[in-house]
């Protein structure tokens, strides 16, 4: 979690803490008052084939339609939970720092690219992110442009707490293309 130190008008620092447990916080000439250092779980954003991207997606009975919309809503500590189904998404799907993308189960969630994005990377990962329990399929690796990977790290990739995790994911490409 990120904690802002100071008031809105006089914010002088931001700190990232995880799993902090303390009875006493001792500092030199700093007064910390009313700070909650208890790490709380983030929000869950739900995605389903019958969802609606105009909805907030914060309840299992009111999901968004696209994974991209779920990712746009999510922030550090949040989870994008994907119900079973076949999803067609514009690749790449950008996973923000600290966000978990979790499919219902490995074979029940299938993600394929929309027309025109088949040679793009499927997922671009930031630090501390996770993708798990899903299948990515029907895209091409393009050896000429070096694109079309299942997973790639973002250009400005940084690790704060841990590196990205990719677990229980099946990647099925349609083959390889060559371009200049």
Language-model regions: role of each:
Residues 1-42, 175:
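Intrinsic low-complexity, repeat-rich intrinsically disordered segments enriched
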Residues 12-15, 82, 100-103, 130-136, ...:
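All-beta strand scaffolds that present successive hydrophobic residues in beta-strands
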């Amino acid at each position: 979690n990120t904690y802002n130190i100071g008031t809105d008008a006089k914010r002088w620092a931001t700190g990232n803490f995880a799993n902090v447990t303390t009875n006493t916080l001792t500092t030199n000439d700093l007064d910390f008052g009313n700070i909650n250092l208890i790490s709380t779980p983030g929000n869950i954003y739900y995605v389903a084939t019958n969802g609606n991207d105009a909805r907030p997606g914060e309840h299992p009975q009111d999901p968004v339609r696209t994974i991209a919309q779920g990712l746009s809503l999510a922030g550090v500590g949040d989870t994008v939970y994907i119900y079973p189904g076949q999803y067609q998404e514009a690749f790449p799907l950008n996973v923000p720092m600290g966000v978990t993308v979790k499919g219902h189960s490995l074979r029940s969630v299938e993600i394929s690219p929309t027309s025109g994005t088949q040679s793009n990377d499927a997922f671009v990962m930031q630090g501390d992110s996770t993708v798990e329990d899903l299948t990515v399929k029907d895209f091409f690796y393009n050896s000429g442009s070096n694109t079309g990977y299942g997973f790639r790290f973002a250009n400005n990739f940084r690790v704060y707490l841990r590196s990205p995790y990719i677990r229980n994911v099946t990647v099925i490409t349609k083959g390889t293309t060559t371009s200049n």
